[in-house]
From Swiss-Prot:
Keyword Metal-binding: yes
Cofactor dependence: Mg(2+)
Entry protein name: Phenylalanine--tRNA ligase alpha subunit
Cell location: Cytoplasm
Gene: pheS
GO biological process terms held by the UniProt record: phenylalanyl-tRNA aminoacylation
Keyword annotations: Aminoacyl-tRNA synthetase, ATP-binding, Cytoplasm, Ligase, Magnesium, Metal-binding, Nucleotide-binding, Protein biosynthesis
Summary of subunit composition and partner proteins: Tetramer of two alpha and two beta subunits.
GO molecular function: ATP binding; catalytic activity, acting on a protein; magnesium ion binding; phenylalanine-tRNA ligase activity; transferase activity; tRNA binding
UniProt entry tagged with the keyword ATP-binding: yes
Signal peptide positions (record): none
Swiss-Prot/TrEMBL catalytic activity: tRNA(Phe) + L-phenylalanine + ATP = L-phenylalanyl-tRNA(Phe) + AMP + diphosphate + H(+)
Gene Ontology cellular-component annotations: cytoplasm
Residues reported to bind Mg(2+): 262
Length: 348
């Protein structure tokens, strides 16, 4: 065996032994070894320099051994690199393994705002009574907001201090009644009565304090058909109050005045804290004012082209904030709008 063959054998055995000793995470050590063996200035290149001393007859044989050694070592380096990568991935997977039997981490979830809860609950009550829910414009025409509600241009209730005007004829609605006017215009009474509620945000030029806000939410109801009477209104109000505040609640109607209804009434509910005995909530009266109502004024019907001698109707309106404050004992309306999570989380 020539000296070159011995050197090749020794280099091969030494390199293979060194590769077996390289562990995962030591890829640089393997790369350095590869350069030192197979690189341009590596051990194999140094051995090849001895080819000049080999006879012409032996050069093909020695060259074959050199190529075999190069192929074996190259394959060994590639196999080692593959094994190191597999070990690296396996170690990484082991460190990141998930125990599927462990309980999951709870996801922080939100909840509906108390006003949304109140609105949806009230809407569900009316839907169950056969009413339709109708939305409308918050930016409204003066004509629909006032004139169609029997509030002519010179009516004192149209004081500028009560309304946000955008132009002389465009304003932010002060109630959701314009939705009812448009609904009466569009309804085909030959197919039956109109039964609807119109929930939504309204705007008044009030100074914000514990009981007043420049914006709040109303739900107004309207029923128009043949032979609709005050008795129908009273029965409807009684049912609404009982569903919202409890079966034991009673109502009391007091005469009042609204331009768009005649007769008009204020609706009181028996105090749900003291049961009518008198307390701070009801101001010692046993009753709590809850909403306004009345029979639709004939002029309001006629402005929609409805024959007031054939058709009649009733209307009512209540504030969602008012209902929520009474039900949950909230004494400051501003809490609904300040975005305080501590306040909102009480009503999950």
């Amino acid at each position: 065996m020539s000296t070159i063959e011995e050197q090749l054998k020794a280099l091969r055995e030494e390199t293979l032994t060194s590769l077996k000793q390289i562990t995962a995470g030591n890829e640089k050590e393997m790369q350095d070894l590869r350069v030192s063996v197979l690189g341009k200035k590596g051990s194999l290149t140094e051995i090849l320099k001895g080819m000049k001393d080999v006879s012409a007859e032996m050069r093909p044989i020695i060259g074959k051994h050199v190529n075999e050694a190069r192929d074996v070592l190259t394959a060994a380096f590639e196999e080692t690199a593959k094994l190191l990568e597999e070990k690296k991935v396996a170690a990484q997977l082991a460190s990141e393994s998930i125990d599927v039997t462990l309980p999951g981490r709870p996801v922080a979830t939100g909840h509906r705002h108390v006003l949304t809860q109140t609105s949806e609950e009230i809407e569900d009550i009316f839907i169950g009574m056969g009413y339709q829910v109708v939305d409308g414009f918050e930016v409204e025409q003066d004509y629909y907001n006032f004139e169609r509600m029997n509030l002519p241009k010179d009516h004192p209730a149209r004081d500028m201090q009560d309304t946000f005007y955008i132009t002389e004829e465009i304003l932010l609605r002060t109630h959701t009644s314009p939705v009812q006017a448009r609904a009466m215009d569009a309804h085909d009474f030959s197919k039956g009565p109109l039964k609807m509620i119109s929930p939504g945000r309204v705007f008044r030029r009030d100074t914000d304090d514990a009981t007043h806000s420049h914006q709040f939410h109303q739900i107004e109801g309207l029923v128009v058909g043949k032979n609709i009477s005050m008795a129908d209104l009273q029965g409807t109000l009684q049912l609404i109050v009982q569903k919202m505040f409890g079966e034991e609640r009673q109502i009391r109607l007091r005469p009042s005045y609204f331009p768009f209804t005649e007769p008009s009434v204020e609706v009181d509910v028996s105090c749900f804290k003291c049961g009518g005995e008198g307390c701070n909530v009801c101001k010692k009266t046993g009753w709590i004012e809850i909403m306004g109502a009345g029979m639709v004024h004939p002029r309001v019907l006629e402005m929609s082209g409805i024959d007031a001698t054939v058709y009649s109707g009733f209307a009512f309106g209540l504030g969602q904030e008012r209902v929520a404050m009474l039900r949950y004992g909230i004494n400051d309306i501003r809490g609904f709008y300040q975005g305080d999570v501590r306040f909102s989380e009480q009503f999950k």
